[in-house]
Curated annotation (Swiss-Prot):
CDD domains given in the database record: TFP_snake_toxin
Record's protein name: Neurotoxin-like protein pMD18-NTL3
Species assigned in the record: Bungarus multicinctus
Signal sequence segment: 1-21
Pfam families in alphabetical order: Toxin_cobra-type
Amino acid sequence: MKTLLLTLVVLTIACLDLGYTKTCFNDDLTNPKTTELCRHSVYFCFKNSWIAGGVERIERGCSLTCPDIKYNGKYIYCCTRDNCNA
């Protein structure tokens, strides 16, 4: 009986995947790239890029939603895998 209970507990923990946290790149133009651990409920990594004053600007990080706004030449990319916003 104890073996069955232990097996059920192990399977429950494995199925819930407790403690998983998404990681996303969070730098601007630094090299090497740095990462951040996103909050538990965050599903997206994002990358915003645009031209300002003739220089390309880049912003990366974690996001709760995937913004679909592209205005004034701003490009927004979202993804759901770890470190996919390179």
